[in-house]
Amino acid sequence: MKSPPWPKGKKLVHLDLKGAPPRLEYLLKLIELFSKLGVNGLLVEYEDMFPYDGDLKLLQATAQPPYSREEVLSMQEFAKSKGMEVIPLVQTFGHMEFVLKHRPMWSLREMAPCVSTLNPHRKEGVRLVMEMLRQVVELHPGLNALHIGADEVRIGVLSDSYGGLRHHFFTYSLYHPLRCTCLARGEESKLWLASPGRTVEQLFLSHVTKVAQAIKEAWPDMTIIMWDDMMRGMSQDTLKASGLVGLVQPMLWDYTPNLDVDTTVSLLEKYCRAGMSDLWAASSFKGSTSVHTCVPSTQRHVDNHVQWLKVAAALSAAVNLQGIAITGWQRYDHLSVLCELMHVGLPSLAACLQTLSLGEFSPEAQSKVAETLGISSVEAEAMGRTTEDESLFPGRRLAELTVELNSLLNSEDIRFFENNMYVRGWFSSYHQQRKMVSPLIAMQIQSQASAYLTALQEKVEALREEMVLLYPESTAQEWIVEHVSPVLAPLQRITEDITACVNEMVPSNILPAHNQTASFE
């Protein structure tokens, strides 16, 4: 059923730079494409890729150099030339792993094992956050809005009834908030909460309010946006009394394809009744399926946007919807593995933006997206090129290689090679321990494993060559180690173990020469 198109307001694309930060040349090509797709703003999450200086220089990435000051300015200037507003996202409470992992910052953790959450009681913590913000604002001339994060101020624990750890923070729905096991667990928080009438909700709100007030004192005209999830369970009265009314604009995020429209509308209306009528939505075009997904499902993310269109259509006139941020996480958090990278998420992004523009994702809309990107299918796993014009889809060759390699890695013949009939029947752990095997069958197993390794090696090298053109070399290395090496290792081990066993049973002068396998570590 068709909904009205997305109402007026910003359409922000989220640039998550804490994983696989694009090289500047590629970043500018992406911004050019975003502009053609109807994007009019960027939500930029620098994390350790920002060129912090002074006492904060230790926050800079070490796996690859952060963006230079000149690169940050170039990105902004180019975005503005395309009619885009740039809104930096700087975490100020939760998801501060990239700060609190450093030894000099350990004392600012809420509790020692919790590397994500800032201690809300330390004045040094607020000073740290404000210095981070000061440096970011200084390097964004004419900045009008800041996003201060403040989501997931906790370590999440999911109940068994919700599927255990199969779901991550970013995929829980409004029905299943995660239990807070970090915030309020520190000794100072326990003392603070021991006073009558104090609650964990007040503890969270007091810190966010302090930060927001400090921002307004420093930059009175600055618009402050924050994630809403920590406020979802709070009453209207609690929000009214928080001191946040008039200071912040909540951004409600839900990335699920079956987003509950009624519940989401109810939440937005609650925020509005509490006095926070300027509100934002946040959807997802990639990075919200599972922590290790490599290729996004376009349909899954289109479905998420279809639900958001229903939400927008059902809101009362009192809700002033400022826009929507279409998120594209490269990691779930600073310490997790890389998930879907930008190049392979572009078909999904284009499809989601077209859905917002038309109110549905009709066959005509699909054709328009395919034509815009020069592909035959909007699903990355099935895309084929219809033109050789690379400018239509920056990073298309890398996207193709990612899809091809991902398919190879997930083929049952390769992923479950150790469990096939011949390995289990003629090269079991018992055979290996005794070094007593059927040489002919063992060498046939080895030949097949070597063939798979060669095919993977060729595809990996092609992907590596293409990836380092768009991302830092460290990104290519990490992606391969995380996503490829676990599949290669069993194949490499089998070929080596077969050689050792066969050498015990066949004269070395008549053994066939086998290709040496490469390590991708």
Show where each model-derived region lies.
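Substrate-binding groove of N-acetylhexosamine-processing glycoside hydrolases
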Residues: 32, 77, 126-134, 138, ...
